[in-house]
Amino acid sequence: MKIKEILCELIACGRNRTQYILEYLTSLGLAVDVQEYLPGHKNIEFVTSNDKAKQDIIFFVHHDISLKTREGANDNTSSVAVLLALAKSIRGKAFPYNIRLVFTDNEELLGALSPSTTAEKLQQIMPHVGSFMYLSKFPDKKNIRHIIVMELSGIGDSIYVASQSGNVMTDVSLNKKLLDIAERNNFQSVQLKLPSTDMLSVKVFRVSGTVIGAIPYYQAQNYVMQGKMFPAVWQNIHSEKDNLFAIQEKALEMMKDFLLHILEEL
């Protein structure tokens, strides 16, 4: 099954994609953990364990979508589809680390925040956010080597690695490793600042992390050089323009291939 076909099936589920994610993973014979932290809100996790591994690499993708869109194809159904395809590719394989693929809920609450959001307001919001609740219950956070958040994986011919997400700085050392992996394996890549606050949960728990995704290379280059003009592909998120029509199979496959290289080389 092509990754875009997985994405189509996810979109057909409407706003609740949890059942599809569960059924897809269990159909592969994979053991899945479900964390229901509030009524109707679920994180879903698949772990490829290594008995000798002492550290964890975690991939976060949020499966909820903005209320302003019916499909949320790029933000963030594309990343969900890529991670499901990755799960199929790595089942039965052993890696130097425990690899945790985590599909989180209610992250769009953070996407709606403004820079002026008060600390008090954040304290009220965070217990509703899937990544925060997942990390709050993680048994031994010092064993987390890295967290890689995936956002906007469905459009573009290059990989972006975020130097900053909203007001949160990402891990400089991790970013360099990822950019080096991209260069060694002939992926076009660019480092840039993201306006969204996808790293907030990671920051709260003081864990190494960053954000990656796909982006048209020349749009990214113009954004990096000019600093103010958002890439056109970002202007369509949280709107009805964020739909299946714009999604590119090549971008989805590129992201999955990059993730496989990360698992082998990080």
Language-model features, listed with the residues they occupy:
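Acidic/histidine-rich catalytic neighborhood of metal-dependent amide-processing enzymes
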Residues: 67-181, 189-194, 198-201
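N-terminal capping segment at the start of a domain
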Residues: 1-16, 22, 64, 228-245
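Short glycine-rich, acidic/polar surface loops and turns
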Residues: 194-229
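Active-site-proximal beta-strand/loop segments in catalytic clefts of secreted hydrolases
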Residues: 48-49, 60-63, 103-107, 150-153, ...
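His/Asp/Glu-rich mid-to-C-terminal helical/loop segments that flank catalytic regions of hydrolases
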Residues: 221-266
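A non-catalytic alpha/beta surface segment that caps or lines the substrate-entry region
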Residues: 2-52
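Glycine/charged-rich beta-loop-alpha catalytic/anionic-binding loops adjacent to active sites
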Residues: 55, 59-69
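Extracytoplasmic/secreted proteins, especially bacterial periplasmic and envelope-associated proteins
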Residues: 2, 16, 20, 24-32, ...
